[in-house]
């Protein structure tokens, strides 16, 4: 039986997802409780840098190859769901913002994978990058939580903002879902940069063992 283009794309995406999951399971990371603060920080910074690079690449691919520069033209109209996140004033605040922003992307990044499979799966590497972003954001969230628990044990988790227009990613209307993807990757690129920058600000205190 010959598969349709949509079915073939779906199977390709599922096989890629399974392959990535097997790869992650086969790699046994060092538990956070066995890392020094500096080692944990280096792990977080490396992960945040990679995540930002991938988010920036996906935005560029979408804008140039799919949306015909509509992402760039409409970027000033984008309001991100994390805009209301509080400004950080202390080292602890920096970590709390990182945790809040990462938390705010957990569900959207899970929803991104099937949306990319449906609408952008034919573009080389987009599916793999969507999976990598989902995994990278989870690792940043886990690591930041663990680091904060060392300096403020028993701290309660703050509320995080929710994206209300995720359903537009699944729209069958091309204009609607392309605009939603543009906004999604614009905001993700912006937030992954914020996380990376905040982690870099923390570096002096980590290196000087102030924690």
Curated annotation (Swiss-Prot):
Q: In which tissues is it expressed?
A: Expressed exclusively in decidual tissue.
What positions does the record give for glycosylation? Answer: 77, 173
Molecular functions per Gene Ontology: hormone activity; prolactin receptor binding
Give any single GO term for biological process: cell surface receptor signaling pathway
**Keyword hit for Signal:** yes
The stretch of residues making up the signal peptide is: 1-29
What cystine pairs are annotated? 80-187
Instruction: List the SUPFAM superfamilies hit by this protein, alphabetically.
Output: 4-helical cytokines (SSF47266)
Check the record and name the InterPro entries matching this protein.
4_helix_cytokine-like_core, Somatotropin/Prolactin
The protein's predominant localisation is secreted
What domain of life?
Eukaryota
Q: Which UniProt keywords apply?
A: Disulfide bond, Glycoprotein, Hormone, Secreted, Signal
Name of the protein in question? Prolactin-3C1
Print the organism lineage: Eukaryota, Metazoa, Chordata, Craniata, Vertebrata
């Amino acid at each position: 039986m010959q598969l349709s283009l949509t079915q073939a794309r779906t199977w390709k995406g599922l096989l890629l997802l399974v392959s990535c999951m097997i790869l992650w399971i086969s790699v046994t990371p060092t538990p956070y409780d066995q890392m020094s603060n500096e080692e944990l920080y280096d792990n977080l910074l490396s992960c945040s840098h990679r995540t930002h690079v991938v988010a920036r690449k996906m935005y560029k691919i979408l804008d140039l190859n799919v949306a015909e520069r509509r992402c760039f033209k409409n970027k000033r109209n984008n309001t991100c769901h994390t805009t209301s996140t509080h400004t950080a004033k202390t080292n602890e605040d920096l970590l709390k913002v990182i945790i809040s922003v990462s938390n705010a992307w957990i569900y959207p990044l899970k929803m991104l994978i099937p949306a990319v499979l449906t609408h952008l799966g034919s573009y080389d590497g987009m599916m793999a990058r969507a999976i990598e972003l989902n995994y990278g954001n989870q690792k940043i969230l886990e690591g930041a939580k663990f680091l904060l628990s060392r300096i403020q044990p028993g701290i309660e988790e703050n509320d995080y903002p929710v994206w209300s227009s995720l359903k537009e990613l699944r729209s069958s209307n091309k204009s609607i879902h392309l605009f939603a993807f543009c906004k999604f990757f614009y905001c993700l690129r912006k937030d992954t940069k914020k996380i990376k920058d905040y982690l870099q600000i923390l570096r002096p205190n980590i290196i000087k063992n102030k924690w």
